[in-house]
């Protein structure tokens, strides 16, 4: 087993085209894991191993890869850059100790880089920054450094400077050692020379080095005092201080290079060893009780403590189901039994494997700090905790956002219905942000996800991986309904047949709840007019109606009910009578409470060349968008807006047309807002027509 201080669990995250997968490939080549480097643009990269990824050139699934550099063990999680897969980024950040943020030397801080950066800040993940593609036309390292400061509000601690620009980029100057690394044109990462700094760069190097030293010495008062008295700290002291500041997130060591041309990647690997934390140097995971409240205990990273492991990804491949685990404490051994705290059931550990993209090495055991996959687990889902059955505990679970878009699918071949059901069951296990439901009335299968591309990929996986071709309906928006007026009302349910009948009377108030509150029920009944044992039945009755609002059948949210009074009959009253009364009361009173349709509003971040700004803003306005800000950069303008999801279908094609293929955008859910009357009327009309057809 590797000593824990030599572990680095890291993620590589970036915008779609910043060169993240290429960078991962170069790391694997340098660490001796692969012999021929795969290029993304010919669909052969090692970590992009789903067909959909290789075809689209974007990374969808976090492939876990283990490799070694300078006697340190790297577990690398390759994360996707497209916004519809942000769930994968969030999921991998949960299990990482550090990260490499890759930025494009010409594109700079692009919309998705900002989203991923924000997630990493929320997860308190220490990072180093790598500005890639400096061989590209228009690449400018110094501009990207300024953008990182201005747009991300982060402090990039510049560690290397580029030698040459664009096609004449030949290497980097390492500021700490004042040495120049210069590669030849062979493309071999090992063919480089370490020389003195080029004379024409000497002043620039000293300026940036002084800034580096001044920032580093702030980490230690004693070193700072000596520095102010004129004593320069040695390189080892500076490295110690940079490590301390990086782990505290005070700054982010920043490197430059070109992964495609194999220039500069070694220094990034050295930085992972020198500055990113080992598993014992990050905050331990809190343990929680069954209700999700913290117990005050922590999963300390120590192989000798009881087992605590988090299942952070489920994947199905040709060998069966793979469950990826991050071990926080204890050991996991082949043939032993562990407890899944989410299900209360035990699982036997069969084969443990260390993953290298889609290849694997079998292991007999794993320890705290490891990221491994286990084959053949039956009832484990993403976010479940596996622990020692004799000393159970639950780790803080992952929280996933609700889907905002849905499509109906039917198999082209009716005989494939069962096959589709099995395939979708596996896909839901693999991706908690993907939901599958059956429309009770039409019998159609409804897929729900985080965006158009997310669902496109799912349909593709059905076809390629599972051999099920489907007909796809047009995308549907996840509207919601609410009420806007307080209504005081009563309802009496009476049913008399032979024998005992049914009787329940309820007096109640329904009113709008706080935004985001969902459904709130309370009872202020006094004097026993509605016995306490029937209150839960009243709540259950109202709650059972929330799934289908009165306007267009969409779920009802932000809805408050207060049971104020009522009446009962000693013989005829029962829980079921009160439940039926509450259901009828919902149907009676909600139409009086000025019901309103709500629509999902998306945060949209668009990048466009200067020449097309007017067209893009005009188009967003036509889509009922509200422009929040626009920011001029060197290569174009970033526009941030809030736009209803219903207006954003097919936007990527329209944006490319408007900007001659150069525009980019990212989009994520923001909040729900009331629909304008004309939109609401149209949605309600469509819903009524759909209902009439069923």
From Swiss-Prot:
It comes from the Bacteria. InterPro entries: EFG_II, EFG_III, EFG_III/V, EFG_IV, EFG_V, EFG_V-like, EFTu-like_2, G_TR_CS. GO terms for biological process: ribosome disassembly. It holds the Pfam family GTP_EFTU_D2. GO terms for molecular function: GTP binding; GTPase activity; guanosine tetraphosphate binding; translation elongation factor activity. Keywords: Cytoplasm, Elongation factor, GTP-binding, Nucleotide-binding, Protein biosynthesis. Residues 5-280 form the tr-type G domain. Catalyzes the GTP-dependent ribosomal translocation step during translation elongation. During this step, the ribosome changes from the pre-translocational (PRE) to the post-translocational (POST) state as the newly formed A-site-bound peptidyl-tRNA and P-site-bound deacylated tRNA move to the P and E sites, respectively. Catalyzes the coordinated movement of the two tRNA molecules, the mRNA and conformational changes in the ribosome. Belongs to the TRAFAC class translation factor GTPase superfamily. Classic translation factor GTPase family. EF-G/EF-2 subfamily. NCBIfam families: EF-G (TIGR00484), PRK12740.1-5 (NF009381), small_GTP (TIGR00231). This is Elongation factor G 1. It comes from Methylococcus capsulatus (strain ATCC 33009 / NCIMB 11132 / Bath).
